[in-house]
């Protein structure tokens, strides 16, 4: 991969990582050498995803977080900075791959 676009060593935070879409994105990031912070509201799905991701690389942590709760997100951010010092990439996938998560065309304007 072109070094200009390399994500190796970058800290990537992925909300909704316990789900299918977020989990697959997280897997790709780990395979590309990123340090991945998997965030989900569901403990069991998060634990399963982190175990799966660690098959591809050890720079993976899972943190329970609720994207609808500011205090929860502040705590998550503090944990990430304490662990890896920074956040380079943020992908907000939580809730986006659920029925009803899209807007009708009349709601977009």
Regions found by a protein language model. Name each.
Residues 49-57:
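Short, conserved SAM-binding/catalytic segment
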Residues 37, 60-63:
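Structural signal for short hydrophobic segments within the conserved structured cores
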């Amino acid at each position: 991969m072109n070094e200009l676009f390399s994500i190796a060593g970058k800290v990537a935070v992925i909300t909704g990582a316990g789900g299918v879409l977020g989990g697959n994105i997280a897997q790709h990031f780990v395979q590309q050498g990123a340090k991945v912070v998997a965030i989900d509201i569901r403990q069991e799905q998060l634990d399963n995803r982190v175990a799966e991701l660690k098959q591809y690389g050890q720079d993976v942590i899972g943190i329970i977080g609720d994207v609808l709760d500011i205090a929860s997100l502040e705590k998550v951010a503090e944990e990430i900075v304490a662990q890896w010092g920074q956040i380079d990439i943020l992908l907000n996938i939580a809730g986006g791959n659920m029925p009803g998560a899209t807007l009708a065309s009349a709601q977009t304007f």
